[in-house]
Amino acid sequence: MRLNSMAINLFTSESVSEGHPDKIADQISDAVLDEILKQDPKARVACETYVKTGMALVGGEITTSAWVDIENLTRQVIYDIGYSHSDMGFDAHSCAVLNAIGKQSPDINQGVDREDPLAQGAGDQGIMFGYATNETDVLMPAPITYAHRLMQRQAEVRKSGKLAWLRPDAKSQLTFAYENNQIIGIDAVVLSTQHAEEVKQKELIEGVMEEIIKPTLPSKWLNQHTKYFINPTGRFVIGGPMGDCGLTGRKIIVDTYGGAARHGGGAFSGKDPSKVDRSAAYAARYVAKSIVAAGLADRCEIQLSYAIGVADPTSIMVETFGTGKVSNDTLVKLIYQNFDLRPYGLIKMLDLIQPIYRETAAYGHFGREQFPWERTDKAEALRLAL
């Protein structure tokens, strides 16, 4: 790759597999949320999970009329991921499951609940960002999009038995080369995957290259200069919670835009939609994607902010990085006219009171068309409003 050109920039994003310890924790927290929402749409949930060798601790603040078998649900999530035998260092059948769940503070609750639902206040103060770019068909940055797809492919060939020596824990990292803000290729591919003890390094490298990397990454972006780092330490037998402890909410950049956009700092998993850390970040993505889909900008970043107990956002900011077809002020006016960004308004707009959250907890919350915040149904209205 012609990296001596002054116009060429490198940008890198990473992803992790569903078997990464932090992602195990995220999936357990969101599985608890989903089970509660099935029974109690008005529940208030803030569920945190910690996993380490031989144990999972589920805690947080939950106010609900629902009953959930936390122990069996936690074991089922761990089993579904693939930790089903003690040989892996973490076993759904034998690990301890500890329950440390309490109730939400009434001080918070009085600022959120209202007789008029549209007056529902934000569950906390905070800032949230949403982003979209037209460099991929899902209007997401390419590095994080394809890093996620590598991890999805790793899980697919692991669970199908095609590469039977694969284990659940894995990480990917992609460095893309850009010239004048256009992708010209992939400069580096990093993929580390947990594996069975008996597999040889040569077999592992060949298997990962042929079954994971080549079927996933577009060949037009790969060339003789692309560098590959497959299990560069040479050994990755001990992984999952035996290798590292895992905690809900510790992969916020993997969950969003891979560092290509700013982040407000709030994690998503385990939080019901009254928490604007989660729901307003989804709404900000919906707004940004709608603007790009409407052709009003090639790139768009939205910032929202809220005050606890207050319904209306305290600010809305638009940045189009010089790619806007209209002014940022015009876009802000269009947002106010077309999107209800009050907590209850955005929950209704995106139909967020439904059990869809466990699926978000691995492979990214954005760029996956099954989620309602990925719709572009308002793009035409934005175009016509000009």
Curated annotation (Swiss-Prot):
BP terms from Gene Ontology: one-carbon metabolic process; S-adenosylmethionine biosynthetic process
Cofactor: Mg(2+); K(+)
Pathway: Amino-acid biosynthesis; S-adenosyl-L-methionine biosynthesis; S-adenosyl-L-methionine from L-methionine: step 1/1
Binding positions (K(+)): E48
Gene: metK
Cofactor note: Binds 2 divalent ions per subunit. Binds 1 potassium ion per subunit.
Name assigned to this protein: S-adenosylmethionine synthase
The entry's keywords: ATP-binding, Cytoplasm, Magnesium, Metal-binding, Nucleotide-binding, One-carbon metabolism, Potassium, Transferase
Source organism per UniProt: Haemophilus ducreyi (strain 35000HP / ATCC 700724)
